[in-house]
Amino acid sequence: MRNPSMGHIFLTTNRAKRSVVLNLKTPGGRDTLLHLARTADVLVYNLRPQAMQRLGLRYEDLREVNPRIIYVGAFGFSQRGPYAGKPAYDDLIQGMCGIPWLTQQAGAEVPRYAPLIIADRIVGLQLAGAIS
């Protein structure tokens, strides 16, 4: 039965997902993640690579517990170049790609962002395709 406090976009996006909350800044949270990684096929993270390094969760760290794991980073900018290491979020990526300019109404003076978290969704689709 649908929970009336949950919107249809949330329900559509998160259908059949399972999740766990871990505080990776604590030894227990990190140990739990490494325990889960032992039997995982893929680990997808969406933190900056520097954060994963500080947490001791680089590819090399995960490979020690599971040599076959596929380690995928979904972060805003590449690891090289002028924006390397900078944080990003959907509105920023939309703006840098010119989406607000492309989607603004004719004659409007103010750009209009896509009403969905479009960049985040596209990244998810691209990751799924790359992994498979």
List the predicted regions and their residue ranges:
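N-terminal helix-loop segment corresponding to the beta1-alpha1 unit
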Residues: 1-132
